[in-house]
């Protein structure tokens, strides 16, 4: 397979899989009337932005650099939200963006005069979420993200055209329905004054089993009831199962177990495997145990077990233990599946480890080098 020929580490995005996701997302927009935006925080692959732009209405950004990236690589609708905008950046953000969403009333009042040409919105803290982990719960206790309903009382909203909420993380249409119920209960008296409402991200639309028809109905019914334009801003759903991270075995050592050291890193290249945590699937291998050594399955006859580890000094830079049909050898390729979303955007050069190259497998089944990183990239960051 083509994996054997490439320089590692490398992310390989597959165009056909990306288009399949985008076709589904575009279909949701067409059937529901919602406008679907790409959330760059989860997927910002420069070589694929034009492809995504064929299907989605634009990008949602978290600050100046993402807004500039959206302008450079897609140049469609640009919606920008930040927990706190900076004085020296707001002017350029306003010039790039169509929508600007403020996180607090103080920020809205501070920058209203500098954003008069934009469609302005406020982020709502629904104070309700079904997020699977508190780390990813934007509506939890002491959350800095958004404005509570009680703080909307007696506020002049004449300059505000939209409301934004974000309360989901890799979740279902049922979860959105539950959040919408609370959102309408708490913020219903202001929704009718708006031109648009943004349902945020975290919608696992392209995952197998997601109830797409329910999502369409929720968006359409909401829009019809309140007379507003609905926006969705998936990130992970765009990049979901569209490509992999390819690494090579650099060394194999024995310490009670066979340990393969790879030219990649969970810490630097797959950080969510540590943060969530989760154990990545590997091509042509089975998971035996998680990185915390939690047993998942037993080793079968004629299989070979290896602990896959990263090439950094972090003791816990471990991917997990896996079963292979044959013994690994130095130079073998290890392919971590579904590693395009929330990886590239989070990469670090910890320990001076090489940034994985960015590659695209196009519709002709030809590999294109999108970004080939070098020492200079490390030097410029430090």
UniProtKB/Swiss-Prot annotation:
InterPro entries: Ala_racemase/Decarboxylase_C (IPR009006), De-COase2_C (IPR022643), Nsp_de-COase (IPR005730), PLP-binding_barrel (IPR029066). Its cofactor is pyridoxal 5'-phosphate. Its EC number is 4.1.1.96. Keywords: Cytoplasm, Decarboxylase, Lyase, Polyamine biosynthesis, Pyridoxal phosphate, Spermidine biosynthesis. GO terms for biological process: lysine biosynthetic process via diaminopimelate; nor-spermidine biosynthetic process; spermidine biosynthetic process. The keyword Lipid biosynthesis does not apply. Substrate binds at residues 236, 272. The modification N6-(pyridoxal phosphate)lysine is found at residue 41. Disruption phenotype: Growth is highly compromised in polyamine auxotrophic bacteria, but can be restored by exogenous spermidine, sym-homospermidine and to a lesser extent by sym-norspermidine. Catalyzes the decarboxylation of carboxynorspermidine and carboxyspermidine in vitro. In vivo, responsible for synthesizing spermidine, but not sym-norspermidine. Belongs to the Orn/Lys/Arg decarboxylase class-II family. NspC subfamily. PANTHER family: CARBOXYNORSPERMIDINE_CARBOXYSPERMIDINE DECARBOXYLASE (PTHR43727:SF1), DIAMINOPIMELATE DECARBOXYLASE (PTHR43727). This is Carboxynorspermidine/carboxyspermidine decarboxylase. It comes from Campylobacter jejuni subsp. jejuni serotype O:6 (strain 81116 / NCTC 11828).
């Amino acid at each position: 397979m083509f994996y054997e020929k490439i320089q590692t580490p490398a992310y390989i995005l597959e165009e056909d899989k990306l288009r399949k996701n985008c076709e589904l997302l575009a279909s949701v927009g067409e059937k529901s009337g919602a406008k679907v935006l790409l959330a760059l925080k989860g997927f910002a692959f420069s070589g694929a932005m034009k492809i995504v732009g064929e299907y989605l209405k634009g990008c949602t950004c978290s600050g100046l650099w993402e807004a500039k990236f959206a302008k450079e690589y897609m140049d469609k609708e640009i919606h920008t939200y930040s927990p706190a905008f900076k004085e020296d950046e707001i002017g350029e953000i306003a010039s790039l963006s169509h929508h600007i969403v403020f996180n607090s009333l103080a920020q809205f009042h501070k920058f209203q005069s500098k954003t008069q040409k934009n469609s302005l919105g406020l982020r709502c803290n629904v104070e309700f979420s079904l997020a699977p982990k508190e780390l990813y719960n934007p509506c939890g206790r002491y959350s800095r993200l958004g404005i509570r309903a009680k703080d909307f009382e007696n506020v002049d909203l004449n300059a505000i055209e939209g409301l934004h909420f974000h309360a989901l993380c890799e979740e279902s249409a049922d979860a959105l329905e539950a959040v919408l119920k609370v959102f309408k209960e708490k913020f219903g008296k202001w929704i009718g004054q708006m031109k648009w409402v943004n349902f945020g991200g975290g919608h696992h639309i392209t995952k197998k089993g997601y109830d797409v028809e329910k999502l369409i109905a929720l968006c359409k019914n909401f829009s019809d009831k309140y007379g507003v334009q609905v926006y969705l801003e998936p990130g992970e759903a765009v990049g979901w199962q569209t490509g992999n991270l390819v690494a090579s075995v650099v060394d194999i050592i024995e310490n009670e177990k066979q340990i393969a050291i790879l030219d990649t890193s969970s810490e630097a290249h797959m950080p969510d495997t540590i943060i969530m945590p989760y154990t990545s699937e590997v091509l042509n291998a089975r998971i035996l145990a998680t990185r915390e050594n939690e047993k998942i399955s037993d080793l079968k006859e004629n299989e070979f077990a290896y602990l896959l580890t990263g090439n950094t000094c972090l003791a816990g830079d471990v991917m997990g233990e896996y079963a292979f049909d044959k013994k690994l050898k130095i130079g073998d390729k290890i392919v971590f599946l579904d590693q395009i979303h929330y990886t590239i955007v989070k990469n670090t050069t910890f320990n001076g480890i090489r940034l994985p190259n960015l590659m695209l497998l196009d519709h002709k089944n030809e590999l294109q080098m999108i970004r080939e990183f070098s020492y200079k990239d490390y030097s410029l960051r430090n």
